[in-house]
From Swiss-Prot:
Protein name: Prolactin-releasing peptide
Gene Ontology molecular-function annotations: hormone activity; neuropeptide hormone activity; prolactin-releasing peptide receptor binding
Gene: PRLH
InterPro entries tied to this protein: PrRP
Residues bearing PTM Phenylalanine amide: F53
Length: 87
C-alpha cells in the first residue's frame, strides 16, 4: 500500500512540475520573420520554400488548357464488361 501511495505521489509531483514548466516556456510568434532570408537561396538549391514564404501561384504551364480533356489513368477491364461509352 505504501508503494502505491509513493507511486501516486511521484506521478502527482511530476505532473505539477511538467505543467509549471510548460507555462514558463516562451512561445514564439509565427509572424516574426527575418527580412534577410532570401527565398531564391533555397530555390536555387532545389528546396521549395512554400511554408516560409507563402504560397506560390501556379505558373501558366501548370494550368490545364480549356479545350483539352484530361487523360484518364484507368486500365481496361478484363472479361466481358462493357464500358458506358460503348452504348
Amino acid at each position: 500500500m505504501k508503494v502505491l501511495r509513493a507511486w501516486l505521489l511521484c506521478l502527482l509531483m511530476l505532473g505539477l512540475a511538467l505543467r509549471g514548466a510548460a507555462s514558463r516556456t516562451h512561445r514564439h510568434s509565427m509572424e516574426i520573420r527575418t527580412p534577410d532570408i532570401n527565398p531564391a537561396w533555397y530555390a536555387s538549391r532545389g528546396i521549395r520554400p512554400v511554408g516560409r514564404f507563402g504560397r506560390r501561384r501556379a505558373t501558366l504551364g501548370d494550368v490545364p488548357k480549356p479545350g483539352l480533356r484530361p487523360r484518364l489513368t484507368c486500365f481496361p477491364l478484363e472479361g466481358g464488361a462493357m464500358s458506358s461509352q460503348d452504348g
